[in-house]
C-alpha cells in the first residue's frame, strides 16, 4: 500500500520521481532511482526518509503507511480538520465504534443529509 500511496501523492503534487528525489536531497539521478525503487517496492523506506517524504508531499506519514483505503481516507480527513474538529472527531470515533446502533443512526442521518443536499442541487440546476 505504501508504494501506491507514494505514487498517488507524488502525482497529485505534480512532481516527477527526479524532482521529489532532488527535494529529498538525494540529487536528481540518485533521487529518481530511489523514488522509483520505493514506488516499485524494491527498496524499503526508513523512518527518517518516510517523515521527509510525508513532509514534502504534504501528507501525514500515517497516510502513506495505512493498511487500507478507508484508513488512509480517515487519516487525511483528520489531517485537514482544524483542532476543534479533530478533538470532536477523536471523541466521537470511539463512541461510534463501541455502539453499532449509534453508528447506524449517524450513517443514516448523513445519507439523509447528503440526499437532501443532492436533491437541492438538482432543483437548483433545473431552475437555472
Task: Describe the role of every protein-language-model region.
Residues 3-24:
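Short basic helix-loop element that most often maps to the first helix and adjoining turn
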Residues 16, 27, 31-34, 46, ...:
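Short coil turns linking two alpha-helices in DNA-binding domains
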Residues 20, 49-57, 64-65:
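Hydrophobic micro-packing sites on short alpha-helices
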Residues 70-128:
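Interfacial/linker helices and their anchor residues that mediate assembly or domain coupling
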Residues 11, 25-26, 36, 40-42, ...:
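Residue-level detection of the helix-turn-helix DNA-binding "recognition helix"
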Residues 23, 67, 109:
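Short acidic/histidine-centered micro-motifs embedded in hydrophobic/aromatic stretches
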Residues 31-34, 40-55, 71-72:
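Short, basic-rich loop-to-helix N-cap that marks the start of a DNA-contacting helix
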Residues 6, 20-21, 32-38, 64:
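Conserved hydrophobic/aromatic packing and binding residues within compact polymer-binding modules
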